[in-house]
């Protein structure tokens, strides 16, 4: 959990990407749109880079490849102390790209300044074409510096989206993601990665929005675990997701 989705939410000022302490929380490519009077930045939050082991992960990595093709600036985020490379082929693309690369060294609030300096030198050697920016997404340290540097690197063009847009995803997508976030939060092992959420009904009335969502699982045994004793599990998911959706 390097902090990509946390950064995206901080940059946009809205919680678009769900956040948990589990790996591979992000399944889809999510666009976050930052609008000001004289600029529009479209951020693309992609799944983390991994070696795909099954079809869903292959699809997730396709989102990453698409982002490579579309980007005017590549932002590669690493966690302080991280040294392993998740995908050598993709990493070579980063090192050889013609697009400007910002390498964000996240979670610097967890170590001393001396260690930050060591890490900066390490990544300068690993990715010589990248500009290194030490940040703390959680504590919002150096966030404005990221925006300022991106603006210096972006081409001048007409905005892609309306000025009041913050994402390209429909509201149903975020309903499904909020429910999935609560499952990731409360369940362990394979269950969080074995579910799919589908919003079946979405009715906007004058004072309330009525939503009916289905949670699909791979095996019958997982159904009982999700529901919980006397329905307490599914009730907790519904209550927490509902509260967050009301704020959203």
Protein language model annotation of sequence segments:
Residues 1-69, 73, 214-216:
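Conserved G1/Walker A P-loop phosphate-binding module
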Residues 3, 142, 233:
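Conserved glycine(s) of the Walker
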Residues 10, 14, 33-37, 49-52, ...:
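Conserved, well-folded catalytic cores of nucleic-acid-processing
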Residues 26, 49-51, 83-84, 111-112, ...:
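Catalytic P-loop NTPase motifs of RecA-like helicase/translocase cores
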Residues 30, 64, 106, 146, ...:
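Residue-level signal for inorganic ion chemistry
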Residues 35-40, 59-132, 203-208:
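Conserved C-terminal guanine-recognition region of P-loop GTPase G domains, centered on the G4
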Residues 99-102, 109-171:
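Canonical P-loop GTPase G-domain recognition
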Residues 171-248:
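P-loop NTP-binding site
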